[in-house]
A protein has these predicted regions:
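Canonical Rossmann dinucleotide-binding motif of NAD(H)/NADP(H)-dependent dehydrogenases/reductases
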Residues: 6-38, 191
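Short C-terminal tail/terminal secondary-structure segment
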Residues: 2-5, 80, 161, 220, ...
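Conserved glycine-rich Rossmann-like NAD(P)H-binding loop of the short-chain dehydrogenase/reductase
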Residues: 33-50
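Conserved NAD(P)H cofactor-binding loop of Rossmann-fold oxidoreductase domains
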Residues: 95-107, 261
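Short, small/polar-rich loop/turn modules that mediate ligand/substrate recognition or access, typified
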Residues: 146, 196-200, 251-253
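Residue(s) in the substrate-gating loop at a strand-loop-helix junction
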Residues: 154
C-alpha cells in the first residue's frame, strides 16, 4: 500500500493565471506544501506582488513569467525556463481564464450584444491556450513521477446558468464563458485517456466565488445553494491538495464540483 504523502517537497509546480484571486491562493497552497513554483500571468505588476508575498512565507524557488499564453512564443518561453532550471514538471494548474465580469467590449453584456471578438478571446484564453501549453509541457511532465494536471473549469461547464440570478445586476453570463468551460471539462477527459498512465488530468469546477458582487446578486445566487453562501478561494484549496499530491494517485479524468450544492437544486 502506498503511503499517503501530503507534501510536495522536491516537486515543481506551474500555475497559470497566478495573479488572480484563485490563482494566487492556489500558488500559496502549493508553496506551503513544499513545491518550487513557476507563476505565469499576463499582469506583471500583480504577479510581482504575488511572488513577493510567497517569498515571505517560503524558501522555495519562485519564478515568474509575465506573458500571454495565447501566443506560441510565450508558451515556448515557459517551457524553456522549466527545462533549463528544473528539467521536469510535477504539477500544472491551469487557472488562466476570462471570467464573466472581465472588462471587455462585447463580453459582459446581453446575448444580442456579445461580440465575435470577445467570443474568440474567451475560447483562445480559456481553452485553446490550455491545450497547447499542456502539449508543450508533455515531455517535462512525463519525466516526473505521478505528475498531475489540474484544470480550473466552472459549474457552467456542466450546467446552464439560471438567468434569474443576474436580474437587476450589472453581471451577465456570456455564452463563450460557458462554452469554453464545457470544452475544458471534456478536454480534460480526452487528455486523461491520452496521457495515461504517466500523467493524471482532472478538473475542478467551482461555483460562484464571493468577491465584490452586489448585494442583489449575492442574495439571488445564495438562494440557489444548499449551504446558504457563496464560495471562497479557500474552499477550493482542499481539492487542489488532493489532486496535486499522491492522495489522488488513482484519480484521473474526473470533474470535482465545489459549489455548495448549487447544481443539485
Amino acid at each position: 500500500m502506498n503511503k499517503l504523502n501530503y507534501t510536495l517537497k522536491g516537486k515543481v509546480s506551474l500555475v497559470t493565471g497566478a495573479a488572480g484571486y484563485l490563482g494566487s491562493t492556489i500558488s500559496a497552497t502549493l508553496v506551503n506544501l513544499g513545491s518550487d513554483i513557476v507563476l505565469v500571468d499576463v499582469n506583471k505588476a500583480k504577479l510581482n506582488k504575488v511572488a513577493i508575498n510567497l517569498k515571505k512565507i517560503s524558501k522555495q524557488n519562485i519564478d515568474i513569467i509575465s506573458c500571454n499564453l495565447t501566443s506560441s512564443s510565450s508558451i515556448e518561453k515557459v517551457v524553456k525556463l522549466i527545462q533549463k532550471k528544473y528539467g521536469k514538471l510535477d504539477v500544472l494548474v491551469n487557472s488562466i481564464g476570462m471570467v464573466g465580469t472581465d472588462k471587455m467590449k462585447g463580453w459582459n453584456t446581453s446575448f444580442k450584444k456579445q461580440s465575435k471578438k470577445s467570443w474568440d478571446n474567451a475560447i483562445n484564453i480559456n481553452l485553446t491556450s490550455v491545450f497547447f501549453l499542456i502539449q508543450a509541457l508533455y515531455k517535462l511532465m512525463k519525466k516526473a513521477k505521478d505528475s498531475s494536471i489540474i484544470n480550473i473549469s466552472s459549474i457552467y461547464g456542466t450546467n446552464a446558468p439560471d438567468q434569474k440570478i443576474y436580474k437587476n445586476t450589472n453581471i451577465n453570463n456570456p455564452a463563450a464563458y460557458s462554452v469554453s468551460k464545457a470544452g475544458l471539462t471534456y478536454m480534460t477527459k480526452w487528455l486523461a485517456s491520452s496521457l495515461a498512465p504517466n500523467i493524471r488530468v482532472n478538473t475542478i469546477s467551482p461555483g460562484g466565488i464571493k468577491r465584490n458582487q452586489s448585494k442583489v446578486f449575492m442574495k439571488q445566487y445564495i438562494s440557489k445553494t444548499l449551504l446558504n453562501r457563496m464560495a471562497t478561494e479557500e474552499d477550493i484549496v482542499g481539492a487542489i491538495i488532493f489532486l496535486a499530491t499522491n492522495m489522488s494517485s488513482y484519480v484521473t479524468g474526473q470533474n470535482i464540483i465545489i459549489d455548495g450544492g448549487f447544481t443539485t437544486k
